[in-house]
Amino acid sequence: MLDQDTARALLTVAAAAGATVALVGDRAQLSAVGRGGVLDMAAQIRGRTYDMSELHRFTDPDYATLTLAMRDRKNPGDVFDQLAAIGLVTLHADDEQAREHITASARHGEAITVATNDDAAALNERIRTGRIQAGEVDDTVTATGSDGLPIGRGDLIQTRKNDTTLGVANRQQWIVQHITEDGTVYARETGSERKSPRTVMLPSEYVGKHAHLSYAATAYGVQGATVNGSHTMLSDATSAAGVYVGMTRGRQTNRLHVVAADMADARVQFIEAMERDRADRGLDHAAHAAQEAVRGLVTDGPVKFVTDELARLDHETERALRGAERWEQIADRRDTERAAHRAEDDESTAALRKAVEAAEQVRVEV
């Protein structure tokens, strides 16, 4: 998820230090928040690339092969059918039932992927309630995170802003160890391979602005993670990259949760999600996709209809203008004729007046 501005800054510093930079990534995953296409541009500029295609994460080789189909976005209906056949698709009556099921079934450390931050907050709140009821989280003394939800001892949280003075990084996860009365949070890093995980102190101001519960997260929050199992909630806001990222986090199992009436409905939703592709596959791919998207429109579609209508309106406008010109010419001729008629009328009136005056004069003389 390296954007162009960050890449430029990184490469500038590396060049000044005489360092070598190797860019590694999967272009089928989520794109950078800023301007993307960095991997594609680097490959075109240097021309020295290596395609790493061997899979190591998954314990099931058949599922590993299935993830390649997700990556390519090809035949999403077939992909769904295979997921359903091996029991990895769970249907729910509504969102609340889905949250209840995930709360009850998700194991500690498993990744839970949702489409939006609001979805994450709703599921985090429900999971936290379940952990309090199970005695895994102490709700006696709490701080408030950036999502507005309380944080207590035992909660899993995520820091969202790099801060070298505190020793924390964006998207880093922590288990809360202690909370003071003023809201200061002491937390131990999780997911680290250190023999002695670090503990950091997070001031209440930082927690309120840059930390929140992290049981569930968007695909941006779980991308790069490797865990034993994962759960992905499908919605109308889920993209193909979100499905691919969510369904490839778990070594052993990756479950898809869908609110749907039946498997046929869920299948349609899955196909629609796989057609919403937000992955950053480079400029060439984007240009090709744009060409394909407008190909039908240009030859026979809305664009042709609009073009034909504009041509028809132009023709009608020209005809109306020509008609207006003719009427103006006719009006000018009529004005000229009326002026001539007025002159003739004036002459006739003058002659009649003179004749009347002459007749009156004769009458007087007689």
Where are these regions (language model features)?
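Conserved ATP-binding/catalytic motifs of P-loop helicase motor domains
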Residues: 1-366
